[in-house]
Amino acid sequence: MAKTPQAHHESERRIKRAFKRKGWSEVKANDSWAIFKVMSEFVMGFEAMQRIRPCVSIFGSARTKPDHPAYKLAEEIAFQLTGNGYGVITGGGPGIMEAANKGAQRGGGTSVGLNIDLPFEQQPNPYIDKEKSLDFDYFFVRKVMFIKYSQGFVVLPGGFGTLDELFEALTLIQTQKIGRFPIILVGKKYWQGLLDWIRVVMGEENSNIDVNDLDLFSVVDKPEEAVAVINKFYSKYMLKPNF
C-alpha cells in the first residue's frame, strides 16, 4: 500500500533528524562514551539469550504481507521447528519475522525477537514472548546474538538485511571463526539467480571461492525439508552456542 504524501514527508523528516550531520568535534566527544552503550547492549543480550532453549533463527523481508505465500511458509517452518524442540529467533519486526514468531507461539515454543531501533520506528511484532523481546541500537551487537545463540539459520526471501545476515554467517564459517551450523535457503526459484552467480562468476570464472564453499548451505522449498536438514545435522553434533 502506497504512503500518503503526508506520511511520506513525515518519514523523510524522521530520517533527516536521525541522520543529522555531526561535526568532528561532536563525533570525537561522543565516541568514547558510545563504548559504554555498546557494552551495555552486549551484557543485556548475553544475559537474556543464555537463558533460552536451543533456537533457530529465521530471516526474511519485513515487507512480506500476511497473504503472501512466503509468510505462510515462514509460519509453518517455525511451527514445525517448535514441534521438534527448537525455539525461534527473529529480528522482531513485521513480515517474515512476524510470521516466524507467530508460528513459534502457535506451536507453544520459545519466541524471541531481537528488534533494532531504526529511523523508521520499527516496532516489535505482537508474537514475541514478553520477556524475550530485546531492543538494540547497534546492528553488529544484534548480529553477535544471532550468530552465537542460533542452532541454524533459515533464510527466506528478503532484501539487503537478509543477505547481510546470510553472508555474515557464511563468512564466519568459511573462515573458521566459528564452527559450522545449518544454513538453509528456502525458495529455490527466488535464490537461483544469486546461487548461479556465486557458482559461475565468483567460482568458475574468477576462483574467488572454493567449490566446497557451496556446501556450506542447503536450498529447499518445503518446511519439512528445512526441519529435516537441521535434525540431520544435530543427530551428529551437540546443541550448543557457536562460540
Short names for language-model regions:
Residues 2-6, 11-12, 22-114, 123:
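Glycine-rich beta-alpha loop segments
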Residues 49-51, 80-82, 105, 125-128, ...:
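Solvent-exposed alpha-helices and their adjacent loops that cap or buttress functional pockets
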Residues 55-57, 87, 109-113, 131-133, ...:
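Structural motif
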Residues 61-64, 117-119, 158-161:
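Short glycine-rich anion-binding loops that position phosphate/pyrophosphate groups of nucleotides
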Residues 95-155:
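Acidic/glycine-enriched connector segments
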Residues 117-122, 162, 190-193:
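Short gly/pro/ser/thr-enriched loop/turn and capping motifs at secondary-structure boundaries
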Residues 137-189, 234-239:
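Active-site/ligand-binding-proximal alpha/beta "capping" segment
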Residues 185-243:
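C-terminal functional extensions of proteins
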